[in-house]
């Protein structure tokens, strides 16, 4: 690119059509703070739109970040009416599915072949927990009875990099899986319906149900590869391992044809004239990797965020911090923010 990319996420906040925003990176680099900050800026700049921030990280830090309890159902952020949050628990989602299977298939004791078959399926597919978490997400962003979309944009606070990549494979994985199940249901669906009926279960049209899910997943897969609808924001710190992980993540995202052109670099010291020798040494180390990133990602939006004296917790503190995603931080004029946050 001939024009240097602005060192902010303003293009994301002002984007009119984005429906999916993923935020991910190595563990411990500030993904939750960044995803929360992006969500807040979106909500503040676009008050007529509705946003949903979802944690797919088993650690679930959204409740801690906002100082408000969130769970598996979307809940509005107190003080920000057009932003809601939810925390998806993959293990819990899978357990609920298995319980639903029991109620649907009935119970014929420990040797029930249908229960055994479902157990084998749910236990043998890699990433099955993320798969059903993803289906849970689709339920929450669907249309209401009045045919109005519940949320304009969904922001994902993802698990550490490996889990993120597995989550992003889900649309194509589910598409292949559902195609196979659809094939089997055509051969065995009537037999299963009869068997379920004889066990007291409800008759189910397997083929139509699978087709319904398959259409939905195929559509989402297309949206993930459309830069007008989906983008990924990488989060890192200025250290070797984090830089290496970020490059690996970007290459993987490109292989999925997913748009990625923004990197948030957290925990920067911005100082080499302090009396703190340790701080100066660390800044010199950070500066070395920052220079590498400036060269390697010259056409990316590189957003450089300061290391603060306190944790960024609570809506008001997140608002203060998040504005530097839009207005680039200047250590000479904005240095006070490092100590300005209120203790939570």
Curated annotation (Swiss-Prot):
EC numbers, comma separated: 3.6.-.-
Gene3D superfamilies linked to this entry: P-loop containing nucleotide triphosphate hydrolases
TM stretches of this protein: none
EC main group: hydrolase
Residues reported to bind ATP: 26-33, 239, 266
An MF annotation (GO) of this entry: ATP binding
Keywords for this protein: ATP-binding, Cytoplasm, Endoplasmic reticulum, Golgi apparatus, Hydrolase, Metal-binding, Nucleotide-binding, Transport, Zinc
Primary site of residence: cytoplasm
Active-site residues, record numbering mapped to chain: 57
Single Gene Ontology BP annotation: tail-anchored membrane protein insertion into ER membrane
InterPro entries, per database record: Anion-transp_ATPase-like_dom, ATPase_ArsA/GET3, ATPase_ArsA/GET3_euk, P-loop_NTPase
Function: ATPase required for the post-translational delivery of tail-anchored (TA) proteins to the endoplasmic reticulum. Recognizes and selectively binds the transmembrane domain of TA proteins in the cytosol. This complex then targets to the endoplasmic reticulum by membrane-bound receptors GET1 and GET2, where the tail-anchored protein is released for insertion. This process is regulated by ATP binding and hydrolysis. ATP binding drives the homodimer towards the closed dimer state, facilitating recognition of newly synthesized TA membrane proteins. ATP hydrolysis is required for insertion.
HAMAP family registered for this protein in UniProt: Asna1_Get3
Similarity section: Belongs to the arsA ATPase family.
Protein name: ATPase GET3
Source organism of the structure: Komagataella phaffii (strain GS115 / ATCC 20864) (Yeast)
Gene that specifies this protein: GET3
